[in-house]
Amino acid sequence: MKSTVEQLSPTRVRINVEVPFAELEPDFQRAYKELAKQVRLPGFRPGKAPAKLLEARFGREAMLDQVVTEALPARYGQAVAESEVHPLGQPEIEVTKKEYGQELAFTAEVDVRPELNLPDPGALKISVDPIEVTDEDVDAELQSLRARFGTLTGVERPVAEGDFVSIDLSATIDGQEVPGATAQGLSHEVGSGRLIEGLDEALIGMSVDESREFTTKLVSGEHAGQDAQVTVTVKSVKERELPEPDDEFAQLASEFDTIDELRANLREQVGRVKRAQQAERIRDAAIDTLLEQVDIPLPEAIVKAQVDSALHGALHSLNHDESKLEEVLAQQGKSREEFENETRTAAETDVKKQLLLDALADKLQVQVGQEDLTERLVATSRQYGIEPQQLLAYLQENNQLPAMFADVRRALAIAEVIRAATVTDTAGNTIDTSEFFGKRPSGDGAADEDADQADESTTADAGE
């Protein structure tokens, strides 16, 4: 078999393939063997009918068509491997020559990853906002911890912000009760905003057994997007009493003996969270900076597939009702055209990021180890509240492991870029990225820079 590649565009190629007829002989033998098992010819045991009789029975052209159809995927895969192209999506295959006893010829057009001119990661400069852990941040965490150990006590007064109430709810549209919109004895924290819009405002000032009506827009169900009249009745009111933030509370709520030790620990926890958030901003800034510097041609078929998938998902959530989608968009102040344009822009950005990170991973020769995959598997399973083995089984069952592998490889690639880049906050202070992106390999530019600074310091000390 021989193949050649034509570059149709930076993101699309045509692979021309020629397969000598002799190379199809094993395919013919397999086809005859399978067919012989399925048919019975007088005088022959099942599976023993000769090929010539099968050809006479079913026709040589029909056999050729079957062999070619079954042979194309493997021959296409072989051509891809030999040409070292990186296909994206499924090919469009056209058989250009198919005659018994002669070579098989076909073409395969497919989108491919474009060649990208990538900058030196060491020349990349990234700047993000600084982080600061304030006393107010610590107070908020302490307040949240106190709330977890608080007690609820019934009160005989109107509802106030922060109270816990038991309520009955019902909703109507044009006087007709909305199915599934009735609830009794529902617990709710006033001011949390966890239920329907307008409820918290209606509850403030209400007393036990008092009812009040308000109008809200339904966000789910068959009446999503419509205005409904909601009636709320207060059945009970409780306030939360918080423990005093003292040493006794610290011993109750933590492993620490004093409130000062507890506050110090909370400060460290807040710092970790803020550093993690800053790391995400660093990652996003690194990708955005690279996207600005690198020209990335887009494979149209891949972008279109992603747009179609997003549109399908939006309609699926609305039972594929186009009119409901129009209603939802109208409530958001968007036209269908604006929605589709936004969806396409998001798809283009997403595809560009994937192409960029894949190219970086190739250039940096990123290798994904078992430990990397296990770490991602454990983190993702924790996020969804399931066991890692459950997630692994789901990924295998739905053929999603390759996607996870690719995602981990991209994460490792951008981490390597960040390790090599110069990362500072907007005040000009260097940010240590090792906590989330790993340490720079010894002997790189950062180590050389540290050595230079040490030499300068030694020289200065010697001159004093």
From Swiss-Prot:
Gene Ontology biological process terms from the UniProt entry: 'de novo' cotranslational protein folding; cell division; chaperone-mediated protein folding; protein transport; protein unfolding
Keyword Isomerase (UniProt): yes
Cystines in this chain: none
Superkingdom per UniProt: Bacteria
EC number(s) reported in the record: 5.2.1.8
GO cellular component: cytoplasm
Pfam families: FKBP_C, Trigger_C, Trigger_N
Keywords, alphabetical: Cell cycle, Cell division, Chaperone, Cytoplasm, Isomerase, Rotamase
Comp. bias regions, Acidic residues: 446-455
Sequence ranges assigned to domain PPIase FKBP-type in this UniProt record: 162-243
Primary site of residence: cytoplasm
Location in or out of the cell: Cytoplasm
Reaction catalyzed: [protein]-peptidylproline (omega=180) = [protein]-peptidylproline (omega=0)
GO molecular function ontology, one term from the record: protein folding chaperone
Residue numbers spanned by region Disordered: 431-464
PANTHER family, alphabetized: TRIGGER FACTOR CHAPERONE AND PEPTIDYL-PROLYL CIS/TRANS ISOMERASE, TRIGGER FACTOR-LIKE PROTEIN TIG, CHLOROPLASTIC
Function text: Involved in protein export. Acts as a chaperone by maintaining the newly synthesized protein in an open conformation. Functions as a peptidyl-prolyl cis-trans isomerase.
Domain commentary: Consists of 3 domains; the N-terminus binds the ribosome, the middle domain has PPIase activity, while the C-terminus has intrinsic chaperone activity on its own.
UniProt record similarity statement: Belongs to the FKBP-type PPIase family. Tig subfamily.
Protein name (database record): Trigger factor
Species: Mycolicibacterium paratuberculosis (strain ATCC BAA-968 / K-10)
